[in-house]
């Protein structure tokens, strides 16, 4: 049944399949990466998304009020985004989640780290919708704690660099569009983990801001 379902999805839908990367062959440690450039291509085929992304060029930074981060100086003064040319701005989000009962005996044994991305070009009211959030990486949280983020994020960062330097050809628009990550979003523990800090609230400096 699973094979037939997968075959049907591949045939009738534009499925971007995950790619398995090996972290430690001896220990059988792996992670899954969903190719971001292919995902971007599929998402940009949606006419509604196209319309909102194209409109963003005219509206970014045009408000005299702070309605989103696009109205702030950090975005307006960014040389990559501040021009008239259309740029794709992405938000990355990192978080851990339990796939077992968090109060049961299997707590933390099967915790998974997910890395997601969202179009920052679309209106802020739409960014928190589940349909606007796309998965990029899945890895066991214990493997990341042992081996670090560098190996797990390597394929994602390599293709993001390609997006920034070479761009992505969008057939429906008939041109190459460049883009990059504007910011990385996470809760306090997730941000400390990505930044290489201790994930604890017990110390005298409980967050990365206290260190400074």
Language model features with spans:
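Alpha-helix capping and helix-coil boundary motifs
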Residues: 1, 14, 45-46, 123, ...
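General alpha-helical segment detector with a strong preference for membrane-spanning helices
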Residues: 5, 21-26, 99, 212
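Structured nucleic-acid-interacting core domains from mobile-element enzymes and related host factors
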Residues: 25-108
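Domain-level cores of phosphate- or acyl-group-handling catalytic modules
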Residues: 71-212
């Amino acid at each position: 049944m699973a094979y037939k379902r997968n075959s049907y999805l591949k045939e009738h839908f534009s499925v971007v399949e995950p790619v398995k990367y090996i972290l430690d062959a001896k220990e059988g440690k792996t992670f899954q990466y969903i190719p971001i450039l292919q995902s971007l291509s599929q998402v940009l085929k949606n006419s509604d998304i196209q319309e909102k992304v194209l409109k963003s060029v005219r509206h970014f930074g045009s408000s005299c009020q702070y309605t989103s981060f696009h109205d702030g100086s950090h975005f307006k003064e960014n040389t990559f985004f501040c021009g008239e040319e259309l740029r794709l701005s992405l938000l990355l989000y990192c978080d851990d989640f339990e796939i077992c009962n968090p109060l049961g005996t299997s707590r933390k044994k099967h915790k998974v780290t997910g890395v997601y991305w969202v179009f920052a070009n679309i209106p802020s009211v739409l960014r928190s919708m589940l349909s606007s959030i796309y998965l990029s990486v899945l890895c066991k949280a214990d493997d990341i704690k042992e081996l670090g983020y560098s190996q797990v994020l390597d394929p994602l960062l390599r293709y993001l660099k390609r997006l920034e330097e070479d761009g992505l050809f969008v057939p429906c628009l008939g041109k190459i569009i460049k883009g990059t990550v504007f910011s990385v979003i996470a809760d306090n523990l997730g941000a400390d983990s990505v930044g290489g800090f201790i994930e604890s609230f017990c110390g005298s400096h409980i967050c990365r801001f206290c260190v400074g």
